[in-house]
Amino acid sequence: MDPEETSVYLDYYYATSPNPDIRETHSHVPYTSVFLPVFYTAVFLTGVLGNLVLMGALHFKPGSRRLIDIFIINLAASDFIFLVTLPLWVDKEASLGLWRTGSFLCKGSSYMISVNMHCSVFLLTCMSVDRYLAIVCPVVSRKFRRTDCAYVVCASIWFISCLLGLPTLLSRELTLIDDKPYCAEKKATPLKLIWSLVALIFTFFVPLLNIVTCYCCIARKLCAHYQQSGRHNKKLKKSIKIILIVVAAFLVSWLPFNTFKLLAIVSGLQERYFPSAMLQLGMEVSGPLAFANSCVNPFIYYIFDSYIRRAIVHCLCPCLKNYDFGSSTETSDSHLTKALSTFIHAEDFTRRRKRSVSL
């Protein structure tokens, strides 16, 4: 097969396709053959353990389950499925891009990465919408924020993500270049580039805009609530801090690589091309950040969500009485939702009184 019939920029696993136009440098080889295998091994070990503990803690915890926990469990499951394929990519990077595990795993692992990417973005979007409904529209959200609705939404996300991953499954193949096996993508046609551009916009940038918008509205509502109630010191700072960290982690993990991917697709559709070396370097540097997102989520939840922290400690050390759940399963979210509901009812009551007086 002609090396020029491979593409380097249509996947979320940046360097899975060889690019014969870019020569290896002395600094590039240690990065791909030494740093990346070590980095991916660390991501694999911490991510598998962290997501297993997170799923077990939330699934087997005593008491009722929060609605947000359903999305978190599915997100952890998606990350875990992806992380299982990481040893294949460790071997690939250690062997300087050679794929030594056969065609089935070439297609299957690439498909799992695509499904994980879509599933993660959609679940994070649903979690932001859930927080938005719970905090900004607590009264109206009671009709939609139900357990059965959450399960239906998660099942739909998995189904849609599996469908969106099919183009990757069909386009990946094990090809020989200079008698060496590579897990590569077939040549990108103009139609495929257009599809990739549309898919990237609607499966990443639109959800990203949704997430940022939801959390901005949440922050605005929290500021208004705490200023009105007179409690705007520690609680306000903590709530805003968690929101900013969640948004920042998402942006740092996904935005750099998808930006380079967007530039690469646009470059392929236009006569003027961006320097291929620049795009390759950008994807090689930003790609591991997207991979690492699958292992950092459990740590973010453990550090910043006291409810999940108690669940994990209770799961690992049931004998610790200080972390017992007790009879109450309410969290800061539920307390805040109740407070905002009361606040909204009070606003409505005041508004109606003013209207009746004016009449």
Curated annotation (Swiss-Prot):
Function summary: G protein-coupled receptor that plays an important role in immune homeostasis. Acts via its natural ligand GPR15LG, a chemokine-like polypeptide strongly expressed in gastrointestinal tissues. GPR15-GPR15LG signaling axis regulates intestinal homeostasis and inflammation through the migration of immune cells. Controls thereby the specific homing of T-cells, particularly FOXP3+ regulatory T-cells (Tregs), to the large intestine lamina propria. Also required for skin localization of thymus-derived dendritic epidermal T-cells.
UniProt-listed Gene3D superfamilies: Rhodopsin 7-helix transmembrane proteins (1.20.1070.10)
Positions in the Cytoplasmic compartment: 55-69, 142-149, 214-239, 305-359
UniProt entry keywords in alphabetical sequence: Cell membrane, G-protein coupled receptor, Membrane, Phosphoprotein, Receptor, Transducer, Transmembrane, Transmembrane helix
Membrane-related topology note: Multi-pass membrane protein
A GO CC term assigned to this protein in UniProt: external side of plasma membrane
PTM summary: Phosphorylation is necessary for YWHAE binding and efficient surface expression.
Protein name from the UniProt record: G-protein coupled receptor 15
Family assignment from sequence similarity: Belongs to the G-protein coupled receptor 1 family.
Pfam family membership, one: 7tm_1
Molecular functions per Gene Ontology: C-C chemokine binding; C-C chemokine receptor activity
Positions of modified residues (Phosphoserine): 358
Source organism per UniProt: Macaca fascicularis
Record gene name: GPR15
Membrane-side (Extracellular) residue stretches: 1-33, 91-120, 171-192, 261-283
Compartments in which it is found: Cell membrane
Positions of transmembrane segments: 34-54, 70-90, 121-141, 150-170, 193-213, 240-260, 284-304
Example of a GO biological process term: immune response
Subunit structure: Interacts with adapter YWHAE; this interaction promotes ER-to-Golgi transport of GPR15.
